[in-house]
């Protein structure tokens, strides 16, 4: 594989995470405007975003098999057509059913793209380089989470309709579409050359279950928290711009945290530092929820930084539970994380409707505590210490 081809594939991976990040994170910013557009209460409007998350979940789950049947380049190009149709549906329809369908299609497209992005990184890089590349790739999720809420606040403050936010997100996929030209993708399944000897199957072990629960609770907690921060902040008397700034601050420090931890993690045992980070994140989230308005930006900045490496470390630890990194195992943990994404508004919507945004934030805090417990318990059963040493060379 040529170096320019590897660079193109790596950038497709980066942008695939940015696309999913933009779609998922911008929800909290535009939810109120979309609720007004359809004349619905915010809590019931949030349920329709479950279609976006369901699309992401279904596509990541199915793509473990689809990648072996349909070439990756074909999937990405077909995804671009679906993206254009979905954004057009949002712009020209006033029907809630069509809005839900468009959200589902956007979820399908971003889930397929993200699973391809994750697969490409695990194929292109090995050993410790894989972990740091995955962390750097995941930082594009946060970068989109920092940029697009600011774009949304800029457009909404100027009374520009909410659907233009999704048109802007579509530009990320346009870049992916352009990169597919003149680019060779790894072949899989029936398209691949079967020269290698089959790899013996390994049992996953109970550590994978702990990591799967941690992945689900972490993503559900993180998105449950960040989706309702704008509404919570507005309830405290903050302006839309200040509320948006809290979300952007979180993702900005999350992004810087990922860059920092891609260097820091190599000096520590991954399970131990993951447990410490999960504990610190749970405490910082509690301080944000119970703290004064003046301290909120500082708590959310430090929360973003210290929680940045948690999810990627969970995935990396998962890949180290077997001697040979299993794509299905990694996909299983990714799927559990995506179930957390799908459940975000299913779980938090009724809580907000019944008890308000602060109750949703406290629920998220409880989920972070579960992540800490799972990571701590993993220390007694993890196999990463016996499997990760060869990867270091």
UniProtKB/Swiss-Prot annotation:
Keywords: Cell inner membrane, Cell membrane, Membrane, Transmembrane, Transmembrane helix. Gene3D superfamilies: MFS general substrate transporter like domains. It holds the Pfam family MFS_1. The chain crosses the membrane at residues 11-31, 51-71, 78-98, 101-121, 134-154, 162-182, 206-226, 245-265, 273-293, 298-318, 332-352, 361-381. GO terms for molecular function: transmembrane transporter activity. It comes from the Bacteria. GO terms for cellular component: plasma membrane. It is a multi-pass membrane protein. The keyword Cell membrane applies. It is found in: Cell inner membrane. Belongs to the major facilitator superfamily. TsgA family. This is Protein TsgA.
């Amino acid at each position: 594989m040529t170096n320019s081809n590897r660079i193109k594939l790596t950038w497709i991976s980066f942008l695939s995470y940015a696309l999913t990040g933009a779609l998922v994170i911008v929800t909290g910013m535009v939810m109120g405007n979309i609720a007004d557009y359809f004349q619905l209460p915010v809590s019931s409007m949030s349920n329709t975003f479950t279609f976006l998350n369901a699309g992401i979940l279904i596509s990541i789950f199915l793509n473990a098999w689809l990648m072996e049947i349909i070439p990756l380049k074909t999937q990405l190009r077909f995804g671009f057509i679906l993206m254009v149709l979905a954004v057009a549906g949002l712009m020209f329809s006033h029907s809630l059913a069509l809005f839900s369908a468009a959200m589902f299609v956007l979820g399908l497209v971003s889930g397929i793209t993200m699973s391809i992005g994750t697969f490409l990184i695990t194929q292109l890089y090995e050993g410790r380089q894989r972990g740091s590349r995955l962390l750097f790739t995941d930082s594009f999720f946060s970068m989109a989470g920092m940029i697009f809420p600011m774009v949304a606040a800029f457009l909404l403050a100027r009374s520009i309709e909410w659907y233009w936010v999704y048109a802007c997100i579509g530009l990320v996929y346009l870049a992916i579409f352009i990169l597919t030209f003149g680019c060779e993708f790894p072949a899989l399944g029936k398209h691949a050359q079967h020269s290698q000897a089959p790899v013996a199957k390994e049992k996953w072990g109970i550590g994978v279950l702990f990591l799967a629960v941690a992945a689900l609770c972490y993503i559900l907690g993180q998105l449950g928290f960040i989706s309702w921060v704008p509404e919570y902040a507005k309830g405290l008397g903050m302006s839309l711009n200040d509320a948006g700034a809290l979300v952007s601050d979180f993702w900005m420090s999350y992004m810087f945290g990922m860059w920092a931890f891609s260097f820091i993690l190599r000096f520590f045992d991954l399970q131990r530092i993951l447990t410490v980070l999960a504990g610190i994140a749970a405490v910082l989230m509690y301080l944000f929820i119970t703290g004064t308005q003046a301290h909120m930006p500082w708590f959310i900045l430090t929360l973003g930084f210290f929680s940045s490496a948690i999810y990627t470390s969970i995935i990396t630890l998962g890949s180290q539970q077997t001697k040979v990194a299993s794509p299905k195992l990694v996909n299983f943990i990714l799927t559990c994380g995506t179930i957390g994404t799908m459940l975000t508004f299913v779980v938090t919507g009724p809580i907000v409707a019944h008890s308000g945004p602060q109750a949703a934030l406290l629920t998220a805090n409880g989920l972070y505590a579960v992540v800490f417990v799972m990571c701590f318990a993993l220390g007694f059963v993890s196999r990463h210490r016996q499997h990760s040493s060869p990867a270091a060379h």
